[in-house]
C-alpha cells in the first residue's frame, strides 16, 4: 500500500510543470558556468593561484573536469534548496487548498501511510535533482575538460587530490548533499501540514534557511551553543570529503545531526497531519 501510494504521489509531482523547473535551472546554470570556464577559465584559475605561484610550480591540466565540478558544486549547492522547496512545499497544503486531501483520506489507507508516501515521493524527487546535478557537474565537466588532479583551497591551505582518489569523494559528497537537501524537503513538507496555502510553506522554508544561515555565519558568542545543531551549518559538509586527511568524525557528526532533523520533522508532521481537520 505504501509503495503504491508513493508511486501515485510521485506521478503527481511529475505532472506539475514546476517540478521540471529544478532540472531546467540546473541544466542552464551549469551550462553557463561550464561555458564561461571553457572560454576564460584560466584567468579565474590564475587569480586563485596567484598567491601560491611564488612558492609552488603548477604543471599539467589544472583546469580539469574534477576542478570544474567542484567549482560548480560550490556555486550551486546552496541554491538548490529553493528548487526542492518549490516542489515539496505544497505536497500537503496544495491538496488541502484544492480539496483533494479529503478524497485521499477517504481511501482505505491510514493518514500516516499517506503522509509517509509524500515524504518518500519528495525524497525521490530530491534524489533525482542531486543525480542530475552530479551528471551535469561531474560527467559533463570531465567530458568537456578532461580528467586531472583536483586542487582544493581550504582554511588549512592548498590540498591536491590525485585523480584516482577523487571519484569516491564525489559519491560521498553527493550523498551528504542529498541528506542536507532531504532535510529541506522534510522541513517544507512538515510546514505544509500546518497550512492550506501552497505558497506559505515554501516562503517560510526559505526564510528559515536564510535565518539559520545568518545565525551560522555571525561571529557572535550568543549563537555558539546552537550553531553546531542547525541543519544549515551542515549543508556544506560535502566539502569535508575533499579534505586530506578525511575528517571522519566531522562527517559522522553532520550525518547524525541531519538524520535527527529529518526524524524530528517527520514525527512532528505525522502528529499534526493525524490531528488535522480536513473535513472543512
State where each predicted segment sits:
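Secretory targeting signals
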Residues: 27-89, 116-185, 189, 236-258
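Transmembrane helix boundary and interhelical loop/hinge segments in multi-pass membrane proteins
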Residues: 85-105, 278
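Short hydrophobic, aromatic-rich alpha-helical segments embedded in or entering the lipid bilayer
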Residues: 223-243
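Aromatic- and glycine-rich beta-strand/loop motifs that create alpha-glucan
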Residues: 1-27
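Alpha-helix N-cap/helix-start motif at helix boundaries, enriched for small hydrophobics
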Residues: 112-116, 273
Amino acid at each position: 500500500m505504501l509503495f503504491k501510494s508513493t508511486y501515485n504521489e510521485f506521478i503527481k509531482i511529475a505532472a506539475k510543470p514546476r517540478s521540471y523547473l529544478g532540472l531546467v535551472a540546473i541544466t542552464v546554470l551549469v551550462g553557463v558556468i561550464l561555458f564561461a570556464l571553457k572560454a576564460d577559465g584560466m584567468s579565474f584559475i590564475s587569480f586563485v593561484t596567484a598567491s601560491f605561484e611564488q612558492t609552488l610550480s603548477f604543471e599539467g591540466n589544472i583546469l580539469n573536469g574534477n576542478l570544474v565540478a567542484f567549482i560548480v558544486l560550490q556555486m550551486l549547492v546552496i541554491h538548490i534548496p529553493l528548487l526542492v522547496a518549490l516542489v515539496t512545499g505544497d505536497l500537503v497544503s496544495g491538496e488541502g487548498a484544492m480539496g483533494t486531501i479529503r478524497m485521499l483520506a477517504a481511501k482505505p489507507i491510514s493518514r500516516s501511510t499517506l503522509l509517509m508516501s509524500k515524504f518518500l515521493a519528495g525524497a525521490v524527487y530530491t534524489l533525482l535533482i542531486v543525480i542530475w546535478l552530479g551528471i551535469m557537474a561531474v560527467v559533463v565537466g570531465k567530458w568537456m575538460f578532461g580528467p586531472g588532479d583536483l586542487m582544493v583551497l581550504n582554511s588549512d591551505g592548498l590540498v591536491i587530490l590525485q585523480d584516482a582518489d577523487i571519484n569516491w569523494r564525489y559519491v560521498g559528497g553527493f550523498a551528504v548533499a542529498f541528506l542536507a537537501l532531504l532535510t529541506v524537503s522534510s522541513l517544507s513538507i512538515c510546514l505544509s501540514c500546518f497550512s492550506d496555502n501552497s505558497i506559505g510553506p515554501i516562503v517560510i522554508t526559505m526564510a528559515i534557511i536564510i535565518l539559520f544561515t545568518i545565525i551560522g555565519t555571525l561571529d557572535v558568542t550568543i549563537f555558539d551553543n546552537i550553531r553546531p545543531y542547525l541543519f544549515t551549518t551542515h549543508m556544506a559538509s560535502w566539502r569535508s570529503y575533499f579534505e586530506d586527511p578525511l575528517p571522519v568524525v566531522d562527517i559522522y557528526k553532520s550525518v547524525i545531526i541531519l538524520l535527527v532533523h529529518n526524524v524530528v520533522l517527520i514525527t512532528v508532521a505525522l502528529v499534526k497531519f493525524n490531528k488535522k481537520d480536513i473535513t472543512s
